A protein has these predicted regions:
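Active-site loop-to-helix "anion-binding N-cap" substructures in soluble metabolic enzymes
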Residues: 1-323
Length: 323
């Protein structure tokens, strides 16, 4: 299939017009179009009906018979390529889109119990968005927290992480999540588990210490050994598992133990597992064969928003086209 570095300009239009039956062409990256970026990233509040007059749509519409979207990973982007063509052309979802939505709907609508969410990493806004949805809906039987998410839970429970770690959290504005964490722990005390020990580096080696005895001047970069064992047991008993984010700074060999052993526990589990997000998939590939995972979602931001109960612009546009 030939490629042309033009998404919708004169060169692209000429090549499309020259296509013969059975031929195809790959057009340039839409993300280089100002319209595609500004409508989503610069908060230009355009409705899909307003996007029908954008250059992209006006250029390609006369050359199209159908609109097929297979990009669930971009489903959270309110851009002309994602939401405008559905109003003007016969529309269909691609096979990958169908698989992605079905896998996530399986988690959201029909999870087999016990359903365990493993939430870690540094993007704690993602974790807290999902946490609220799956706790309020009753879909999560248990949430295992690691990374910064787990440390926020510790702060919300009254533990001190020492000046180094607490300054790290505050300097990045992540302490704003402590209030939400306190509320979740109050409402769902038996559904959220946080680390009972953390790990730091001492003389080049990993050292685990109980959360009640954390030193003040250390930087904690992984869940501790006892926490790992507790989480492994919960994962082994789970029937449905969703994972987003690593347990620690696995890129550093000193702090890879938590992430590595959790992934191996998930791979060995008989439960149905779903993972997604770039960092999550990268971490999984380092330690396990992805064929041991029930479903690997290609999406990051779109997946998080979908599981957080937010209506995605693409999904809304596709449903409107059906109606």
């Amino acid at each position: 299939v030939p490629y042309i570095d033009d998404p919708c300009g004169p060169a692209a239009q000429q090549r499309i017009k020259a296509l013969r039956s059975g031929e195809g062409i790959l057009l340039g990256n839409l993300r280089y179009l100002t319209e595609e970026i500004s409508t989503f990233e610069n908060a230009v509040k355009l409705e899909p009906k307003d996007m029908k007059d954008t250059y992209l749509v006006r250029s390609l519409l006369p050359l199209c018979d159908f609109y097929v979207n297979d990009a669930f990973a971009a489903a959270h982007r309110n851009a002309p390529s994602m939401v405008a063509f559905q109003q003007l052309l016969p529309t269909a979802a691609g096979l990958l889109m169908q698989k992605e939505v079905e896998a996530l709907d399986n988690i959201m609508e029909h999870p087999e119990s016990p359903c365990v969410f493993v939430l870690g990493g540094a993007k704690i806004s993602d974790a807290f968005g999902m946490m609220k949805q799956v706790l309020q809906s009753g879909r999560a039987d248990l949430i295992l927290t690691g990374g910064i998410t787990g440390e926020i839970m510790l702060l919300a429970s009254g533990y001190r992480l020492g000046s180094v770690k607490e300054n790290f959290i505050c300097d990045r504005g992540l302490d704003v999540f402590v209030k939400d964490a306190e509320e979740y722990l109050k409402q769902y005390p038996y559904k959220i588990k946080f680390p009972v020990d953390l790990a730091y580096e001492q003389n080049g080696e990993r050292k685990s210490v109980p959360v009640k005895d954390l030193p003040k001047e250390e930087m904690f970069m992984d869940i501790g050994d006892e926490t790992i064992c507790l989480y492994e047991e919960e994962i082994a008993n789970a029937k449905t598992i969703f994972v987003n984010g690593p347990a620690g700074v696995y890129e550093n060999p000193v702090f890879e133990e938590g992430t590595k052993r959790i992934w191996k526990a998930i791979a060995a589990s008989e439960g149905y597992s779903v993972i997604g997000g770039g960092d999550t998939v990268s971490a999984a590939q380092r330690y396990i064969d992805l064929s041991d995972i029930g479903y690997v979602c290609t999406a990051g931001g779109a997946m998080v928003r979908y599981l957080s109960g937010n209506e995605l612009p693409l999904i809304k546009a596709m449903r409107s086209a059906k109606e």
